[in-house]
Amino acid sequence: MGDQRFDFDASISRLGTHSEKYDGRQRIFGKDDVQPLWVADMDFAAPPAVTAALIARAQHPIYGYTDPPESLYADIQNWLQDRHEWTVAREDILLTAGVVGSLHAAALAFAGPGEGVIVQPPVYFPFFSAVTRSERRLLLNPLIETDGHWQIDFEHLERCAAMGAKALLLCSPHNPVGRV
């Protein structure tokens, strides 16, 4: 798979596939003719190896709960070490079904009701609701844009921390500004 090339330019219609990005435009924006630039939902085909693995699994007639193989954790550890020189212990890896549920879990785990959680806008909108729906206090630490370059306002971040923040929900790489 390492030498395989993918066509990132092919136009593939997703209309009629229950795609929130395309089929949901009328519900979300009140019209269908808007460009869906609001969500990080890719418009290129999945790699053939991924499609083949999903088909092979789907051919088994029972869809029960999955117990990830232990090798998955080693793969995650190796990837983090190779790409980021980050050594992560096996017990520090928690698999989740998606980022939004993880944001809610983090707000619940690291701050109590009414306690502060810092979010750095502009950011993917579920960061805000993860805090407010968890009955935590939303503390905003807006990023600063200078000549098209976004950065953290560390002085303001310190003030947020001094206001009793118990957690910071960090988006990295940052969506939508792209900083790591």
What are the residue ranges of the model-derived segments?
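Conserved core of the PLP fold type I
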Residues: 63-180
